[in-house]
C-alpha cells in the first residue's frame, strides 16, 4: 500500500492521502492521530481481506464493512458510531488507498516481462451512529487502474 487517506474517520474530518514507504515512521504529539492512521490502515486491509458479500455478485448486494474484531486484529473501534468523526456533517466514512506493485509476468509464448500495477481504491461506508452497529454498509466502491485509465464505480 503506497497511500492512505480518509474522511470522517475517528479524529479526522479529512486526511489527505499520505505516502507510505517500505518503512514509515509516525512521529507526533499525543492525540495527533498516529494511532488513528494505523487503525485506518489495518481496518482497510482487514476488510479488503475478509469482505463478505451476500449472493453471487457484488453488483446486486451491498457489502458490509466491519468495525469490530476479526480474525486478524481487534482495533478497539467496535462500532460505526465510534469510528465516525464526532463532528461529521453526514454519517459516511470514506477510505482511500493507492496500491502499486512491480509485477513479473509471462506471455503466451513464455516470454517474461515487467509491468507496474497501479490502482486507486475508494470505499464509502454509511451507518447509524446512534446504535451499537458493528458494521457499516458499503455505499460505494470506486477502483481505478491508473495505468490503463479504466475506472469501475459501484454505487449501491
Model regions and ranges:
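P-loop NTPase switch/coupling surface
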Residues: 1-156
Amino acid at each position: 500500500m503506497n497511500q492512505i487517506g480518509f474522511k470522517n474517520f475517528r479524529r479526522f474530518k479529512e486526511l489527505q492521502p499520505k505516502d507510505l514507504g517500505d518503512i514509515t515512521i509516525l512521529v507526533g504529539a499525543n492525540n495527533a492521530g498516529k494511532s488513528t492512521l494505523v487503525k485506518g490502515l489495518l481496518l482497510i486491509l482487514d476488510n479488503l481481506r475478509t469482505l463478505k458479500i451476500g449472493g453471487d455478485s457484488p453488483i446486486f448486494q451491498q457489502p458490509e464493512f466491519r468495525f469490530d474484531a476479526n480474525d486478524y486484529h481487534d482495533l478497539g473501534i467496535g462500532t460505526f458510531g465510534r469510528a465516525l468523526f464526532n463532528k461529521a456533517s453526514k454519517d459516511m466514512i470514506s477510505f482511500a488507498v493507492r496500491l502499486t506493485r512491480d509485477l513479473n509476468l509471462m506471455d503466451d509464448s513464455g516470454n517474461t516481462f515487467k509491468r507496474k500495477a497501479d490502482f486507486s481504491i475508494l470505499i464509502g461506508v454509511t451507518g447509524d451512529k446512534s446504535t451499537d452497529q458493528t458494521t457499516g454498509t458499503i455505499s460505494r466502491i470506486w477502483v481505478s487502474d491508473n495505468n490503463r485509465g479504466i475506472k469501475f464505480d459501484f454505487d449501491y
